[in-house]
Swiss-Prot record:
Residue numbers annotated as active site: 104 (proton donor), 175 (proton acceptor)
One BP term from GO: pyruvate metabolic process
Protein name: NAD-dependent malic enzyme
Keyword Oxidoreductase: yes
Similarity comment: family membership: Belongs to the malic enzymes family.
Organism: Escherichia coli (strain K12)
pH dependence: Optimum pH is 7.2 to 7.5 for L-malate.
Keyword vocabulary terms for this entry: Metal-binding, NAD, Oxidoreductase
Enzyme Commission designation: 1.1.1.38
Key word tRNA processing present: no
Length: 565
């Protein structure tokens, strides 16, 4: 259902003159009416012509096209965001296909690497370990009292780029931009946070422009105590907030999620969001092929927290489709840099232990090696689905893809690593190596592939199809927790919007132009499941839909009325 157009109430504003123009959430620039210019002491501070937001957006689009590099376009858009947020979101929504890769992956990776160099204006909250005893004061300095979504990172595992220190702040800023652009969550309700616990990136420590705490990262008890102080301070200031953990290192991501997911409404997008969008994609791809996900054999390259999170959600989905847990686990094979995970492998991480294959069941495999490589696994398993979350480029070789295709007429290949430079194989190569038969979904955006005069659209398995809808659903329903069932409902809803399933052709995932519609549908499904799970107050379907409508922010100016502080 599309959001209803409703008359916005006037806002009563105590600020005036140049001060008002400095508020990105309130600034309208040349769109202030003549009456507003008189009432707010703006006469003479703006050019004479009063413009509409569409006229402003057209000028901004022309200016944007004048920039030649993606990083310069990113800097330009961030400048608009820090000047006039309403215009920023109107512009982005007008050109989402073009601009999403610029405000988020892959360009945000370069923006994180160059954060201190391209820094213009502060956005969000920087909490350094040096200021840990001022945590409550720091959060009290945030002027917005009604924060509903926080995205927090410690900058240690930024995309596939590793430790970027406080440069990781680019990720929460970008993620929250998508919460608004795709999920309709008002920017006034969002807060990006970076926990500055030092950096082990020597290049940053030696950089005279680096703006973070110049110290090796704190670890162990010091680290977890610091994060806990942050969580407790957040609960004190905004007890009902949704907290998203973002780009934490593998060694910390799962422990933090497990520790806090039942203490505060929280989730980890790298683990749970990636899993949800991947499972939604696989459900749709399986249906398009006339089957179910439970019928497929799946091989992963990459057995970190993200890969294992996806695998566990796939297992949950195939159990929902009728498999026993044992049968579901026997269909999933995890390969990391040491080979296939088996019960004889030492030094497994806690979240890997349930995803091993029993070595005794592999005695008839065609291999002489003790270390079972990806090629060994593909040759013996004969998988239907190959998923890459390794963060290493080129590991899906021609030999591996052709071996897979030899036994699977319509292979599903998903090189999900970000950014583009880390992808396991390009869609162009995968399509060519499978004679045009592979169904490909990637983690980063790729242009359609042309092979033998046929055009193959490439779906981006983008978490933006999932997390904005989850956020909107949590806010609209008032959910106190995010359960696994809520995530599964998001995956199922995403699959229902697949053009390939609905029309028998096109991409396996919806087009970006439909992302707000998809987010609203996911919000409803998530909110309804929250009610069924007992983590939100039960209401009628009509009341939940109305709450979604009421919370869906649109990039439109509102009339201002003057008031005193």
């Amino acid at each position: 259902m599309e959001p209803k157009t409703k008359k916005q109430r006037s806002l009563y504003i105590p600020y005036a003159g140049p001060v008002l123009l400095e508020f990105p959430l309130l600034n309208k620039g040349s769109a202030f009416s003549m009456e507003e210019r008189r009432n707010f002491n703006l006469l003479g501070l703006l050019p004479e012509v009063v413009e509409t937001i569409e006229e402003q957006a057209e000028r901004a689009w022309i200016q944007y096209q004048g920039f030649k590099t993606e990083i310069d376009k990113h800097i330009y858009l961030r400048n608009i965001q820090d000047t006039n947020e309403t215009l920023f979101y109107r512009l982005v929504n007008n050109h989402l296909d073009e601009m999403m890769p610029v405000i988020y992956t892959p360009t945000v990776g370069a923006a994180c690497e160059r954060f201190s160099e391209i820094y213009r204006r502060s956005r969000g909250v920087f909490i350094s370990y040096q200021n840990r005893h001022n945590m409550d004061d720091i959060l009290q300095n945030v002027p917005n009292h009604n924060i509903k979504v926080i995205v927090v990172t410690d900058g240690e595992r930024i995309l596939g780029l590793g430790d970027q220190g406080i440069g990781g702040m680019g990720i929460p800023i970008g993620k929250l931009s998508l919460y608004t652009a795709c999920g309709g969550i008002s920017p006034a309700y969002t807060l990006p946070v970076v926990l500055d616990v030092g950096t082990n990136n020597q290049q940053l420590l030696n950089d005279p422009l680096y703006m973070g705490w110049r110290n090796p990262r704190i670890t162990d008890d010091e680290y977890y105590e610091f994060v806990d102080e942050f969580i407790q301070a957040v609960k004190q200031r905004w007890p009902d907030v949704l907290l998203q953990f973002e780009d934490f290192a593998q060694k910390n991501a799962m422990p933090l999620l497990n520790r806090y997911r039942n203490e505060i409404c929280s989730f980890n997008d790298d683990i749970q969001g990636t899993a949800a969008v991947t499972v939604g994609t696989l459900i749709a791809a399986s249906r398009a092929a006339g089957g179910q996900l439970s019928e497929k054999k799946i091989v992963f390259l990459g057995a970190g927290s993200a890969g294992c999170g996806i695998a566990e959600m796939i297992i949950s989905q195939t159990q929902r489709e009728g498999l026993s847990e044992e049968a579901a686990r026997q269909k999933v094979f995890m390969v990391d840099r040491f080979g296939l995970l088996t019960d004889k492998m030492p030094n497994l991480l806690p979240f890997q232990t349930k995803l091993v294959q029993k070595r005794e069941n592999l005695s008839d495999w065609d291999t002489d090696s003790d270390v079972l490589s990806l090629l060994d696994v593909v040759r013996n398993v004969k998988p239907d689905i190959l998923i890459g979350v390794s963060g290493q480029t080129g590991l899906f070789t021609e030999e591996i893809i052709r071996e897979m295709h030899k036994h699977c007429p319509r292979p599903i290949v998903m090189p999900l690593s970000n950014p583009t430079s880390r992808v396991e194989a390009t869609p162009q190569d995968i399509i060519a190596w499978t004679e045009g038969n592979a169904l490909v979904a990637t983690g980063s955006p790729f242009n359609p592939v042309v092979w033998k005069d046929k055009i193959y659209p490439i779906a981006q398995c983008n978490n933006a199809f999932i997390f904005p809808g989850i956020g909107l659903g949590v806010i609209a329903s008032g959910a106190s927790r995010i359960t696994d069932e809520m995530l599964m409902s998001a995956s199922e809803t995403l699959a229902q919007y697949s053009p390939l399933v609905l029309n028998g052709e096109g991409m396996v995932l919806p087009e970006l132009k439909d992302i707000q519609k998809v987010s609203r549908a996911i919000a409803f499904a998530v909110g309804k499941m929250a009610q069924q799970q007992g983590v939100a107050v039960k209401t009628s379907a009509e009341a939940l839909q109305q709450a979604i409508d009421d919370n869906f922010w649109q990039a439109e100016y509102r009339d201002y009325r003057r008031t005193s502080i």
